[in-house]
């Protein structure tokens, strides 16, 4: 195949982006060639053609984002190669360059994204220590986490629902195994070595300004270099890195996030969905971060609660504020798109409309006395008002983006175009009078431009200055010097309007970039106001109460599960009291009685308090916990080759390793994944260890042997769920009371579940027979458990 200059250009650029699908702009299409074309054709279900024996597939340039989304979702990295000059102005081969590389984590366009964060994560490791840098390119947020605990790193990656992992080669296989559905890319070690990238990106004189470890600085440098590579930009929209540290935040393992249903996942209803009554995308993202990272500093928690309380106490102003916030747009992402030259005119309109709300919002905020005044960049607002149409149509260059009155030169060219039709009508009338041809017509098409059309019957009347341009079946088309001059002016006006609109739009965007710092500050303040006002709204709507903090006391009166109560009628409230003297609660009772719901609600109430939220209870006095741990449910880990019991023991090992006397531990049926005797033995030994450690523990179990702990340890208290029997009917009251369950009611639960009557009746027969045999053998009449006692009474 003969290689043309165009194909030489393509091959040269493709060589630089071997690992990407290259979409190569050719006129009105983006074309893919060779193997890329085959992939594009298959994924997008479009026709595969050929150009000079090279497989080729193309997509219209105006529909790029629609097709791009499908390619990225299919797991491909895509390099966009654009024409860098107008074809009409280039007599040689048009200059083309890659303008961005699109991956799941480098997307900034609105139509690709939901309101939630879109994190990529750079993961590095040195000598058993792990560092993860999370980045949402669409908002500029950067988070840094460092730990010697591999599982803690994996938990955070899972909690953040990352869309992309970037790592050195030696970590790829293990990360790919743990996160098989996440796009994972390896980068060379030199990405981690250029620490000057950090200094340049943040304009730092001293790289130690951020107080990050050498490992974290290397990972941050790798992130910056990668974002530069994908965005094809030297100036990045990255916020200063925020360190996720146990000194400031509670670290939640992925099991706890899942077991307490904190955020959207596989378990349906969750705490975030219940609390998320935010009015802005920024507020929703911040609220989710608060839920994933509760505070551990009592002063900071109480400051949030104070703000929420002020809002709750002034419902009229709260409603007014939330109404104003409902008109706020996603400033954070707009700023990012402007910074990376990906913004559209409607972004600037949305930015202006948001900023115009600030003066009125400041008036409302002043009534509460707990919020600082929002910055108001009046000059920028004035520029946006004058420059951008209120309802812009199309892209810059199409003549309907820049307002009239902003540029006198642009207005002149627009006037010329707007009066063109009128001028043509005048010209047409003049030519009819001059020639005497009443059916003479002036028209336009894209091939020949402007023309005068005369029927063949009138050809004898045409003047000498008419120059033939085209012959049709029944007519001829002509041009005159005057019409040619008019056409030149019109075409020049169209071209100049396109140039001017693009230039003016770019200049307005440059002005927005100059205000980036203040706009991001406004965005952060709006997010915080929205999140706090949402917590106040939740408190009012759901009848929550303000929690009070204590050194060691956990007292909840009339506690409710914040998620379950939203979808259940007549939810039963429950109380709990724990302190350093009584800090370990064993809860027995049948299935379906509400044991799991109860211990989860204690965890959720504690967590909600530490994000600064009011809580679902009549009264709540709580300690500030450093961690909340959970071991609940039965699940295996097929990808990791772990059985249900091994998963359970791994999670318990983590709890025993990490918990302190400031931790809350919630256990549900620990030990049931093995034989009864082994299970009870393990559960008892774990309980002893946690009692000695001083954690506050709620342990829901079917092992009645564990109720004997109360006789050996004064810190233990037994609770059960009250069950009422009316004839053959069993009523689960869901009420937690002191005591020990005397029956499991397993057969009754099976009956409620719809097991056939013949099976239920047979089960009763077997139960009765075993009961009689056990009574004869042991001389006891406890129908709850037929297990052999392992510990002295």
Swiss-Prot record:
GO terms for molecular function: ATP binding; ATP-dependent DNA damage sensor activity; damaged DNA binding; mismatched DNA binding. GO terms for cellular component: cytosol. The gene is mutS. SMART domains: MUTSac, MUTSd. GO terms for biological process: mismatch repair. Pfam families: MutS_I, MutS_II, MutS_III, MutS_IV, MutS_V. NCBIfam families: mutS1 (TIGR01070), PRK05399.1 (NF003810). This protein is involved in the repair of mismatches in DNA. It is possible that it carries out the mismatch recognition step. This protein has a weak ATPase activity. ATP binds at residues 589-596. It comes from the Bacteria. Belongs to the DNA mismatch repair MutS family. The keyword Cell inner membrane does not apply. This is DNA mismatch repair protein MutS. PROSITE patterns: DNA_MISMATCH_REPAIR_2 (PS00486). Keywords: ATP-binding, DNA damage, DNA repair, DNA-binding, Nucleotide-binding. The keyword DNA-binding applies.
């Amino acid at each position: 195949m003969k290689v043309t200059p165009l194909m030489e250009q393509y091959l040269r650029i493709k060589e630089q982006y071997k690992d990407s699908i290259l979409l190569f702009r050719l006129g009105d299409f983006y074309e893919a060639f060779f193997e890329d074309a085959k992939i594009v054709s298959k994924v997008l279900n479009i026709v595969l053609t050929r150009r000079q024996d090279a497989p080729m597939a193309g997509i219209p340039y105006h529909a790029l984002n629609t097709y791009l989304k499908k390619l990225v979702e299919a797991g491909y990295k895509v390099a966009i190669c654009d024409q860098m000059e107008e074809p009409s102005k280039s007599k040689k081969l048009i200059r083309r360059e890659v303008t961005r590389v699109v991956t799941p984590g480098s997307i900034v366009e609105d139509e690709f994204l939901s309101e939630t964060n879109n994190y990529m994560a750079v993961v590095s490791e040195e000598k058993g220590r792990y560092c993860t840098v999370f980045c949402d390119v669409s908002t500029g947020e950067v988070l840094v986490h460092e730990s010697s605990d591999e599982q803690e790193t994996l938990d955070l990656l899972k909690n953040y629902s990352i869309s992309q992992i970037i790592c050195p080669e030696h970590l790829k296989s293990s990360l790919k195994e743990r996160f098989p559905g996440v796009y994972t890319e390896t980068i060379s070690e030199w990405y981690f070595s250029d620490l000057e990238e950090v200094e340049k990106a943040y304009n730092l004189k001293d790289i130690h300004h951020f107080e990050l470890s050498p490992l974290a600085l290397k990972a941050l440098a790798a992130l910056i270099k990668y974002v530069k590579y994908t965005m094809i930009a030297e100036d990045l929209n990255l916020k200063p890195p925020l360190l996720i540290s146990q000194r400031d935040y509670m670290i939640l393992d992925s099991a706890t996030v899942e077991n307490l249903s904190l955020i959207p996942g596989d378990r349906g209803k969750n705490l975030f969905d219940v609390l998320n009554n935010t009015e802005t995308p920024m507020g929703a993202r911040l609220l989710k971060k608060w839920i994933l990272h509760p505070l551990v500093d009592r002063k900071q928690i109480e400051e949030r609660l104070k703000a929420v309380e002020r809002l709750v106490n002034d419902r009229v102003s709260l409603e007014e504020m939330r109404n104003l916030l409902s008109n706020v747009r996603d400033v954070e992402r707009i700023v990012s798109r402007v910074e990376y030259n990906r913004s559209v005119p409607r972004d600037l309109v949305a930015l202006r409309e948001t900023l115009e709300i600030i003066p009125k919002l400041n008036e409302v905020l002043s009534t509460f006395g707990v919020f600082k005044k929002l910055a108001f960049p009046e000059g920028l607002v004035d520029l946006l008002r004058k420059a951008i149409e209120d309802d812009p149509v199309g892209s810059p260059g199409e003549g309907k983006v820049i307002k009239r009155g902003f540029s006198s030169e642009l207005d002149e060219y627009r006037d010329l175009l707007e009066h063109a039709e009128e001028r043509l009508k005048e010209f047409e009338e003049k030519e009819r009078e001059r020639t005497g041809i009443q059916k003479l017509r002036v028209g336009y098409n894209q091939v020949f431009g402007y023309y005068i059309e005369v029927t063949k019957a009138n050809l004898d009347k045409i003047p000498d200055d008419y120059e033939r341009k085209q012959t049709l079946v029944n007519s001829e088309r002509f041009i005159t010097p005057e019409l040619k001059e008019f056409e030149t002016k019109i075409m020049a006006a169209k071209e100049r309007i396109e140039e001017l609109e693009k230039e003016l739009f770019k200049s307005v965007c440059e002005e927005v970039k100059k205000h980036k710092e203040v706009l991001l500050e406004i965005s952060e303040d709006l997010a915080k106001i929205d999140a706090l006002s949402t917590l106040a709204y939740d408190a009012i709507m759901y009848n929550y109460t303000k929690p009070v903090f204590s050194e060691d006391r956990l007292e909840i009166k009339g506690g409710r599960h914040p998620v379950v109560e939203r979808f259940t009628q007549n939810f039963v409230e429950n109380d709990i009291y724990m302190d350093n003297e009584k800090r370990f609660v064993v809860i027995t009772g049948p299935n379906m009685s509400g044991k799991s719901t109860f211990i989860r609600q204690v965890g959720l109430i504690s967590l909600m308090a530490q994000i600064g939220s009011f809580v679902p209870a009549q009264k709540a006095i709580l300690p500030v916990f450093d961690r909340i741990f959970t071991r609940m449910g039965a699940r295996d880990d097929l990808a990791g080759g772990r059985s249900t019991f091994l998963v359970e023991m791994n999670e318990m090992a983590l709890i025993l390793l990490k918990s302190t006397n400031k931790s809350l531990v919630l256990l549900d049926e620990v030990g049931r994944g093995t034989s009864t005797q082994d299970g009870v033995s393990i559960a008892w030994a774990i309980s002893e260890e946690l009692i000695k450690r001083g954690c506050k523990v709620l342990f829901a179990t079917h092992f009645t042997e564990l109720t004997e702990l109360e006789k050996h340890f004064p810190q233990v208290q037994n609770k059960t769920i009250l069950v009422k029997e009316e004839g053959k009917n069993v009523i689960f009251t869901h009420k937690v009371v002191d005591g020990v369950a005397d029956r499991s009611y397993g057969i009754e639960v099976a009956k409620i579940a719809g097991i056939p009557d013949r099976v239920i009746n047979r089960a009763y027969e077997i139960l009765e027979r075993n009961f009689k045999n056990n009574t004869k053998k042991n001389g006891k009449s406890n129908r709850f458990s037929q297990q052999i006692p392992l510990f002295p009474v």
